[in-house]
Design a protein with these regions (language model features):
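Glycine- and acidic-residue-biased ligand/ion/polar-headgroup-sensing regions
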Residues: 64-77, 81-82
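Short acidic-glycine-tyrosine-enriched beta hairpin
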Residues: 82-98
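Ligand-binding loop in jelly-roll beta-barrel domains
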Residues: 98-125
Length: 125
């Protein structure tokens, strides 16, 4: 686990193969306003859970990896360098290509699933 300023990031997967993944129960474990938990690693890809009380993450980018966001509940705006922001509601998804400067903003309490390659620096490169 790492606490970086206003973020709590749990890199160790909460689940392994052949385990039932109860995302609702994982959400209940959130103990920080900007909480990030790796749920499982499958074939070199991470499924991560973000539970955000509201507010903004810092501007960052991932040089080598794309990032995928799926909103479970709430509203997430993804601000993108040189492009209009994208607003996501529950059931909506968006992918940010590698190398693009971006900043997620939780417009209200929001739960998000994120997919990234293993080894990603969650806070950006």
């Amino acid at each position: 686990m790492a606490e970086l300023g206003d973020y709590k990031i749990n890199y160790e997967p909460l689940f392994g193969p052949l385990q039932l993944i109860d995302v609702g129960e994982a959400i209940k474990r959130a103990d920080h306003p900007w909480y990030n938990q790796t749920l499982i690693e499958v074939g070199g890809v991470l499924l991560r859970l973000g539970v955000f009380a509201g507010g903004e993450y810092h501007w960052h980018k991932h040089q080598e990896q794309d990032e995928f966001f799926y909103v479970i509940d709430g509203r997430l705006r993804i601000e993108l360098e040189g492009r209009d922001p994208v607003e996501l509601a529950a059931g909506m998804a968006f992918s940010v290509p590698r190398g693009m400067l971006h900043r997620p903003v939780a417009l209200e309490p929001t739960q998000v699933l994120m997919i990234e390659e293993s080894g990603v620096a969650v806070t950006g490169d």
